[in-house]
C-alpha cells in the first residue's frame, strides 16, 4: 500500500510468481469506511500479508507522514487481522511517475493519429486525476517489489524475515 491522506495506492503479488501488479486506488472517505473496503479487498484477494510504504525523509528520519503511515499500518493490522510490514518508500512515487510517463509515452505515440485535435480542458483534468491514481497504484507496486526483493535477498543469505 502507498498510504496517502486522499488516496491509498494498492498492489498485489502472487505468492508463487511474486510479481507485483498495480491493483488500483482506494479513494479515502473516512477511517471506518476505508477499513471496511480494505477488509473486503483483503478477503476477496486472499491476502496473507500487507506491506505499507513508510515515507521517510531523504535523511532517513520520520516526519509527520511517516508517523501517520505507521498509525495507519497499526490500525490495519488490528482491524483487518493480517500481518502488516512497513517498507522504506523513499523515491517510489518518483519512480512510479517515471515508469508511468515512459509507458504512457509509448502508448500515446502508438495511438495518436497524425493531425489529432487537442483535448478539451475537462478531458485533460480527468486524465490528470487518473494519472495521480495510476501513480499511487504503481508506487504501491514499487513498494511491494522492494519488499519482495528484500525477502529474496534474506532467503539467499539464510536470514529469516
Predicted regions and their residues:
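Two-metal-ion RNase H-like nuclease active-site motif
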Residues: 1-2
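Phosphate- and other anionic-substrate recognition elements at nucleic-acid/protein interfaces
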Residues: 5-161
Amino acid at each position: 500500500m502507498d498510504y496517502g491522506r486522499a488516496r491509498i495506492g494498492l498492489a498485489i503479488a502472487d505468492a508463487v510468481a511474486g510479481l507485483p501488479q498495480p491493483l488500483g486506488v482506494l479513494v479515502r472517505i473516512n477511517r471506518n469506511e476505508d477499513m471496511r473496503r480494505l477488509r473486503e479487498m483483503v478477503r476477496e484477494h486472499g491476502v496473507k500479508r500487507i506491506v505499507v510504504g513508510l515515507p521517510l525523509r531523504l535523511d532517513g528520519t520520520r516526519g509527520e507522514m511517516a508517523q501517520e503511515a505507521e498509525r495507519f499500518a497499526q490500525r490495519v493490522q488490528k482491524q483487518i487481522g493480517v500481518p502488516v510490514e512497513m517498507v522504506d518508500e523513499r523515491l517510489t512515487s518518483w519512480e512510479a511517475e517515471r515508469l508511468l510517463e515512459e509507458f504512457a509515452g509509448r502508448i500515446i505515440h502508438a495511438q495518436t493519429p497524425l493531425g489529432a485535435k487537442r483535448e478539451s480542458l475537462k478531458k485533460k483534468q480527468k486524465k490528470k486525476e487518473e494519472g495521480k491514481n495510476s501513480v499511487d497504484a504503481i508506487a504501491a507496486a514499487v513498494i511491494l517489489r522492494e519488499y519482495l526483493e528484500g525477502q529474496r535477498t534474506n532467503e539467499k543469505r539464510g536470514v529469516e524475515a
